[in-house]
Design a protein with these regions (language model features):
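C-terminal His-loop and adjacent cap/lid subdomain of alpha/beta-hydrolase
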Residues: 1-306
């Protein structure tokens, strides 16, 4: 179910290789009267997110697409809860069905039942879907312990919750189940949605399965994420710093990560034609990403004048 009560659906294609991709799409997020009553793209049905004709790794007519032969399940986003909620709340006259978790689980269950023996699993996400990618990658590792898993976060590297918003009742997070997190602690605490950076999720995921491969992409001045970070009581001007600090934090815990930070204010690359156009000092993003897909862990590409 989408946040407006409309029926939810996801998209699937069978490829010609033994590689399987689980892609979580993004959109807006909301958690209170203000954010859930302003116009929000995630409050509309899933039908409009049909990825046919999109760019990046979703462009199935482009032979330069490094995942063109892969099987894929595309998980649309229409619930305002980064694919993680399981609650229905009223905001004034507006009723929001935050049902991202059961929606995503329907796609996830189909994915693992349809591709139980893939040689490599890529769990990818853009925007809000980039947060979900880490959680469902852990569930994939739990379901298929021998799986070769790669996780890529597109455009959420600087997001930080500060405790100013209690996301548990807002999204019904206690009504979800990610049992791979059971018993895991970092600095004496379990993973806490109300006090979490993007680094924490990958650190916990690496504790559970140290064989997972990680990558990320961000824009230093991402206006969308600066806006949402501001709603979480973070100074928007700090976003570029948070991106870098997040990856450094991850790597300080022994987790190897390939990261790209570009200088602009764009939001999301995996679904965009920009995927094939971006270069930095003669390094092509599509070539860099392909190298990451091949397990080569390319060096970080971080903008210096941004």
């Amino acid at each position: 179910m989408c946040s407006d009560g409309s029926e939810y659906s996801f998209y699937s294609r069978d490829g010609d290789s033994d590689v399987a991709v689980l892609f979580f799409n993004g959109g807006g997020a909301c958690w209170n009267d203000f954010t859930c009553t302003v116009e929000n793209s995630s409050s509309t049905g899933a039908y409009w997110q049909n990825p046919t004709g999109w760019g990046g790794i979703l462009d199935l007519d482009n032979r330069n697409n490094p995942l063109i032969d892969a099987s894929m399940v595309f998980v649309p986003y229409c619930t305002g809860d980064v694919h993680m909620g399981n609650a229905t709340l009223s905001y004034g006259d507006n009723v929001m069905h935050h049902r991202g978790y059961p929606n995503a689980m329907s796609a996830f269950d189909y994915f693992i039942s349809s591709h139980p023996n893939a040689s490599t699993y890529y769990v990818l996400g853009s925007s809000g879907g980039a947060i979900a990618a880490g959680f469902y990658a852990g569930s994939l590792s739990e379901e298929i312990p021998e799986a070769n898993i790669f996780v890529f976060h597109d455009s959420t590297g600087g997001v930080t919750s500060t405790g100013t918003t209690d996301l548990y009742p807002a999204w019904g997070l206690n009504n979800t189940s990610f049992t791979w997190l059971d018993g895991l602690t970092y600095n004496g605490s379990s993973l806490d949605w109300n006090d979490m950076t993007s680094a924490h999720l990958d650190i916990f995921l690496n504790m559970y399965d140290p064989d997972i491969t990680y990558g990320r992409f961000d824009s230093a001045q991402d206006e969308t994420m600066k806006y949402f970070n501001g709603l979480l009581n973070n100074p928007p001007e700090d976003y570029n710093w948070r991106l870098r600090n997040s990856e450094l934090h991850i790597e300080s815990e022994g987790v190897e990560m390939s990261g790209w930070i570009e200088s602009g204010d764009n939001h999301g690359i995996l679904f965009s034609s920009w995927f094939y156009q971006l270069e930095d000092e003669s390094v092509s993003f599509s070539d860099w990403f392909t190298s990451w897909l091949n397990g080569e862990m390319p060096e970080d590409v971080w903008c210096t004048d941004c």
